[in-house]
UniProtKB/Swiss-Prot annotation:
Locations listed in the record: Cell membrane; Cytoplasm; Cytoplasm, Cytoskeleton; Cytoplasm, Cell cortex
Positions bearing N-acetylalanine: 41
Gene name in the database record: BFSP1
Protein name: Filensin
Lineage of source species: Eukaryota, Metazoa, Chordata, Craniata, Vertebrata
Protein function: Required for the correct formation of lens intermediate filaments as part of a complex composed of BFSP1, BFSP2 and CRYAA. Involved in altering the calcium regulation of MIP water permeability.
Expression across tissues: Abundantly expressed in both the inner and outer cortex of the retina, expressed at a lower level in the nucleus of the retina (at protein level). Detected in eye lens fiber cells (at protein level).
Annotated region (Head), positions in chain: 1-39
Keywords: Acetylation, Cell membrane, Coiled coil, Cytoplasm, Cytoskeleton, Eye lens protein, Intermediate filament, Lipoprotein, Membrane, Myristate, Phosphoprotein, Repeat
Length: 757
């Protein structure tokens, strides 16, 4: 135990002593590193690495020596007998090692001082060399400048010498010419002297000339000296100007260099600003495109919501006022006046006009005129229905409406002698719940067709100027030329689900043989703008020149289902169930209480699309116009033909129901004159894809079954942008109650007609 602890202490002491040497060398290295110049970094790094390796080698040698001595001490301890001798020897060894280490320390300190002196000498030498290099560099630059100046001076002197040489050559040439002239003059004078006589006068003249010549020569000599002086002055000015020119050229070069740098900097700034402007313009275009899309989508959704609210409110008010005959106020964009009780028959007309006004007008297209004719047909049929309801059964007489080819309708009462009625007993004078059922079925078709119709015109944006095709899943599509096809495509779909107790359209219900059907003609209706201008001769005018004209019984679809309003249908004779749109839920009302069908004991009010106009005594008093007789021959012959044609067309429409929309009956002013009966006419039309099977069955008995159709409309507006596609969906559910009736007995119909008459 003692031996083991002793060995541990010895090893620890030796290890700490071995570590003292590198630790003592660290401050010296740091001092050297701080004192060294920056350009000695590489040399110092190399020296530090070499010193580190040397110190590590020395430490390893010392550790090896310590371990060797410890091993020898342990071996000697094993040989000794007592611990005192071992301790004494060990202490002696430690003292000897301490003396050796002290000597080694003094030696290392001496070597460190010598190395420090050598380093100081080397640093001083290096600094001296650096100073010498700087001096030599400055001297070299100065000598280069002097050499450049000497070269420039030499060049200037050479140029000046060249100019002077040219001037000297020119002066020599000029002097040679003058000398030749003088010699020529002298020779001429000599010849003259030789040839002329030696007279005193001539001699005196020659002397005078000689004097003059000498004077002229002296003057020329003075001029020559003056010219030389001027040449010297000009040369001095030329040297000055050359020096100024050189200075200016140098200044120009310096300015060019400076301005080139500035221009480059400005060009870089301009490029940077141009890139930023382009990026800002792109972001602005994206933002403006998104804003336009959002505005279009917002306006479309707001228009749809307002349209549905207006449809629900106006149709609920109109239908309720149509039965109780009270004035109402229409909250529409185009009709805001309050109607009087006399004009109660115009409610359904105004409803159809509001629905038509909600659609975008396709001006300039060939489909516009048939759509207007269709709306006029609906309006006039509704006017006839409401006028018949207001007059009541006691004011009615057998009468027919004869539509001439010129567009004028004449109402002629039936003459018993000249024109007997079409059916004996006049069963058309006996309205019952079937007429009301027919009217409500017409409203139901209008509602479904309006739901399938196109949207209201969206606010035009600058970006969209091309035509847009709004596809309606089903029978057709509407064309709206106001928008672009790739901007905000609007899609609509209609899903129709029928109840369990619905009567299939191919059941045994047949139309009554006593209701003639006008011929089917497309595009023959008068335009909607001229509806109030048509008059009937002999008929009671309603309001100011607005005749109640009856139109076709079926609805024509152009490129898609026509529009309709009237989500809210009020029932008489039973309490309403639910307040959603004033419509009943699935499950059905009890028999005899559906869609405003009145009981048999109540006074009948006739509502149909093919009602005859009849003239009563009250209207005769008000209008003050005498009745006119019926054309009997035309009426009797055309009743049978139209019944046959109608039944054939009904069969064709049943077969083609799944392929396209039903045609519209719109007799115009050029159509043949046809008599109209008071009972409704059943037309099975529409497409099965849209669920628009609206077959109004005629029956005098209460309805046996009630059919419910649930029309679910989903309209989606897709917004296309550069990053993503966002879809907005709006869903409206309309539950519509339709009354199906079975075939009644002809005998029972005749009895009821005679009793009602």
């Amino acid at each position: 135990m003692y031996r083991r602890s002793y060995v541990f202490q010895t090893r620890k002491e030796q290890y700490e002593r071995a570590e003292e040497a590198p630790r003592a060398a660290e401050p010296d290295r740091l001092a050297e590193a701080r004192a060294a110049a920056p350009n000695l970094a590489a040399l110092q790094g190399l020296g530090e690495r070499v010193a580190a390796h040397v110190q590590r080698a020395r430490a390893l040698e010392q550790r090896h020596a310590v371990l060797r001595r410890q091993l020898d001490a342990f071996q000697r301890l094993d040989e000794l007998a007592g611990p005192e001798d071992a301790l004494a020897r060990h202490v002696e060894g430690n003292r000897q090692r301490a003396r050796d280490l002290a000597a080694e320390r003094t030696r290392l300190e001496r070597q460190g001082a010598e190395a420090q002196r050598a380093l100081d000498e080397f640093r001083s030498k290096y600094e001296n060399e650096c100073e010498c290099q700087l001096l030599l560099k400055e001297m070299l630059e100065r000598l280069n400048k002097e050499a450049d100046e000497a070269l420039l001076r030499n060049l200037r002197l050479q140029i000046e010498a060249q100019f002077l040489q040219d001037d000297i050559s020119a002066a020599k040439d000029r002097y040679k010419k003058n000398l030749l002239e003088i010699q020529t003059y002298v020779t001429i004078l000599q010849q003259i002297i030789q040839t002329t006589p030696q007279a005193a006068a001539i001699t005196s003249g020659m002397r005078e000339e000689k004097l003059l010549t000498e004077r002229e020569a002296a003057a020329l000599q003075c001029q020559l000296e003056d010219g030389r002086e001027m040449i010297c002055l000009l040369q001095a000015q030329r040297t000055e100007l050359q020096a100024q020119t050189a200075a200016l050229e140098q200044a120009i070069r310096d300015a060019h260099e400076c301005y080139d740098d500035e221009i480059q900097l400005y060009n870089e700034q301009i490029d940077t600003l141009r890139k930023e402007i382009e990026e800002a313009e792109r972001s602005l275009e994206r933002s403006s495109y998104d804003c336009r899309q959002l505005v279009v989508v917002q306006q479309t959704l707001r228009n749809e919501l307002d349209r549905y609210h207006r449809i629900i409110e106006n149709e609920g008010n109109r239908l309720s006022s149509a039965f109780i005959e009270t004035p109402i106020t229409l909250y529409t964009a185009s009709h805001g006046a309050s109607l009087s009780p006399r004009h109660g028959g115009k409610d359904l007309t105004r409803a159809v006009q509001d629905i038509t006004a909600a659609k975008p007008r396709l001006k300039g297209l060939p489909k516009n005129l048939p759509r207007k004719k269709e709306m006029v047909a609906k309006d006039r049929a509704d006017e006839i229905l409401e006028e018949t309801l207001l007059r009541g059964p006691e004011d009615m007489k057998p009468g027919r409406v004869v539509i001439k080819e010129e567009g004028e309708s004449k109402l002629e009462p039936g003459d018993e002698e000249a024109s007997p009625p079409t059916q004996e007993g006049a069963p058309e004078d006996v309205p019952d719940g079937g007429k009301i059922s027919k009217a409500f079925e017409k409203l139901g078709k209008m509602i479904k067709e309006k739901v399938k119709g196109p949207k209201e015109p969206e606010p035009p944006a600058d970006l969209y100027t091309k035509g847009r095709y709004v596809m309606v899943s089903g029978d057709g599509s509407f064309v709206d030329p106001g928008f672009c096809v790739f901007s905000v495509p609007a899609k609509g779909g209609v899903v129709v689900s029928k109840g369990d107790d619905s009567v299939p359209p191919d059941s045994g219900v047949e139309p009554s043989p006593q209701q003639p059907e006008p011929p089917l003609e497309e595009g023959q209706g008068p335009p909607q703008e001229k509806e109030d201008g048509l008059k009937e001769e002999g008929g009671p005018p309603e309001g100011k020149g607005e005749p109640p004209e009856g139109k076709g019984d079926s609805v024509k679809e152009e490129g898609g289902p026509p529009e309709g309003k009237g989500d809210g249908v009020k029932e008489e004779g039973g309490p309403p169930e639910g307040k959603g749109d004033g419509v009943k839920e699935e499950g059905g009302p009890p028999e005899g209480k559906g869609d405003g069908v009145k009981k048999e004991g109540e006074p009948p009010e006739g509502k149909g699309e093919g009602l005859k106009e009849e003239e009563g005594p009250l209207q005769k008093k008000e209008d003050g116009r005498p009745p006119t007789p019926h054309p009997a021959d035309k009426g009797d012959e055309k009743n049978a033909k139209e019944l046959k044609g109608l039944q054939g067309k009904q069969d064709d429409q049943k077969e083609e129901g799944a392929r396209g929309p039903c045609p519209m009956v719109a007799p115009g002013p050029e159509g043949p004159s046809t008599p109209r009966s008071q009972g409704p006419q059943v037309i099975l039309g529409g497409s099965e894809g849209h669920g628009a099977r609206s077959g109004s069955r005629l029956a005098r008995s209460p309805p046996r079954k009630l059919a419910y159709e649930k029309v679910e409309v989903m309209e989606s507006i897709e917004k296309f942008s550069t990053e993503s596609i966002q879809t907005y969906e709006e869903t409206a559910v309309i539950v519509e109650t339709m009354i199906e009736k079975t075939k009644a007995n002809k005998k029972k119909l005749g009895e009821k007609g005679s009793s009602s008459a």
